[in-house]
Curated annotation (Swiss-Prot):
Gene name of the record: hisI
Cofactor(s) named in the record: Mg(2+); Zn(2+)
Keywords on record: Amino-acid biosynthesis, Cytoplasm, Histidine biosynthesis, Hydrolase, Magnesium, Metal-binding, Zinc
Statement: the UniProt record of this protein carries the keyword Amino-acid biosynthesis: yes
GO CC terms, sorted: cytoplasm
Protein known as: Phosphoribosyl-AMP cyclohydrolase
Amino acid sequence: MNTETKPLPAWLDKVRWDDNGLVPVIAQEASTNDVLMFAWMNREALAKTIETQRAVYYSRSRKRLWFKGEESGHVQHVHEVRLDCDEDVVLLKVEQVSGIACHTGRHSCFFQKFEGTVDAGDWVAVDPVLKDPEHIYK
């Protein structure tokens, strides 16, 4: 069995990785341009995302790769990968399987909207729960 790790491609060097070797990533629905979520990638996650055409992130809390949908089935098929003008943010244009990107069971992680004024305002959930998270994660 070959246990050698294949070297990572040189194009990864164009990305401006932070001091922890990570880059912020925004996932956007390709068909609607809805912003679905924000996450992080390391070099291996970005390379695997491009190789598999499925979103792979890096979990800072678990300190490991996180294959989007590995537990929920709500995978993201990647249509495009873009790098911003400063080369320090990645944008994934994805097809969100089942329409649920958020662990709360919503379409987007950005479901809270600020309403009111600076002195009398609050964050309000404005998008519906599409599926109870207790039925998503077992």
